[in-house]
């Protein structure tokens, strides 16, 4: 089992499955999932209105040292997350500390704002590709891409492989086993 704190960050309009399924996989692997919000509201709703989430904590109340990984769901949320410096700083600091940063679909928009994609192989929803390239990333059309501590995926259909890659990366760091 994987022990420790992993993190999912959330904002209004997240893609429901891109938050729910990684959370479930991480919990099933034995991690403690902490939901971090921007603080813009008390309850965040999924884009498809299937989920309502109350964050455990606000981004300006935590630091990268509190967590082992960050998972960024897609949907409309990443574009809103970019408006909050505390969210950007948390992602940048975690990345610079060698923590796993995993983003799916539109999630890499936040990676652009955190200025951590320069020279990195990444993937995303196809409409985000030009933004990633303009930020200096090497965009590829593959289901899941890992470049160092950065893991990216394209879309909801890629979630099973995305989850497996996150858990394998955490297992490689912490030397424990986990089932997805």
Regions inferred by a protein language model and the residue ranges of each:
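Extended, subdomain-level signal for the structured scaffold at the beginning of enzyme domains
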Residues: 1-97, 101, 110-116, 129-180
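Short, thiol/selenol-centered motifs that function as redox-active sites or metal-ligating centers
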Residues: 104-106
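Exposed beta-strand and adjacent loop surfaces of beta-rich binding modules
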Residues: 119
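Anionic-ligand binding patches
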Residues: 122
